[in-house]
């Protein structure tokens, strides 16, 4: 009987996403992948995490994944825009995502870029930077802390964890947000009846 031979891996098996071993530590969320666009691997991106969708035109590379610590690096191949009822949607082409199946595999994931690539000024903030900040009224009454930031079709929302350990939603618009105090890491809000109701 011949000796047993070592099994070899099946090269045809799908290894899954090639997540970066050591992702950059300065990743900032710049978009969210709605779904594929067409059959050639293009992606529909919600760019509301950045104040300027045109940033994508100057980015050489982005990182795609469910979390900034678990991402895949992609060079940007193409950028164009589409007007929708919700505003501007970015149609993004990425190297390595070449057909609809590839695009489906990354749908509903986030898109990140490094602070260095974005050329952020020292005083520039993204919504994710505000998680953990204190929310207070003009009179200084603590309303809670920012637990999350939600990008919604009508308007973006801050999710606030109240002192009673409930969640409240604050629209991220000028009618509600009076001041964003970076030095104190707090957001000053205008109290409106029902605003902080869970």
Curated annotation (Swiss-Prot):
Entries under InterPro entries matching the protein: PRC_barrel-like_sf (IPR011033), PRC_RimM (IPR056792), RimM (IPR011961), RimM_N (IPR002676), RimM_N_sf (IPR036976), Transl_B-barrel_sf (IPR009000)
GO biological process: ribosomal small subunit biogenesis; rRNA processing
Renumbered residue ranges of the record's region Disordered: 1-21
Keywords tagged on the record: Chaperone, Cytoplasm, Ribosome biogenesis, rRNA processing
Annotated PRC barrel domain residues: 122-195
GO molecular function, one term: ribosome binding
Major location (coarse): cytoplasm
Known function: An accessory protein needed during the final step in the assembly of 30S ribosomal subunit, possibly for assembly of the head region. Essential for efficient processing of 16S rRNA. May be needed both before and after RbfA during the maturation of 16S rRNA. It has affinity for free ribosomal 30S subunits but not for 70S ribosomes.
Domain notes: The PRC barrel domain binds ribosomal protein uS19.
Subunit details: Binds ribosomal protein uS19.
Protein name, entry field: Ribosome maturation factor RimM
Gene (name only): rimM
């Amino acid at each position: 009987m011949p000796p047993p031979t070592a099994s070899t891996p099946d090269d045809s098996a799908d290894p899954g996403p090639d997540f970066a071993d050591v992702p950059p530590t300065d990743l900032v969320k710049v978009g969210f992948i709605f779904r594929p666009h067409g059959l050639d691997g293009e992606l529909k991106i919600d760019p509301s995490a950045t104040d300027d969708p045109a940033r994508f035109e100057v980015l050489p590379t982005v990182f795609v994944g469910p979390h900034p610590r678990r991402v895949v690096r992609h060079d940007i191949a193409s950028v164009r825009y589409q007007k929708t009822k919700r505003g501007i949607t970015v149609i993004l082409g990425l190297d390595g995502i070449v057909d609809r199946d590839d695009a489906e595999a990354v749908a509903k994931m986030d898109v990140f870029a490094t602070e260095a690539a974005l050329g952020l000024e020292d005083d520039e903030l993204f919504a994710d930077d505000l998680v953990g900040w204190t929310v207070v009224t003009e009179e200084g009454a603590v309303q809670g802390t920012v637990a999350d930031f939600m990008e919604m079709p009508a308007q973006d929302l801050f999710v606030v964890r109240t002192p009673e350990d409930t969640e409240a939603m604050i629209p991220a618009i000028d009618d509600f947000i009076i001041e964003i105090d970076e030095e104190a890491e707090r957001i000053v809000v205008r109290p409106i009846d029902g605003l902080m109701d869970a």
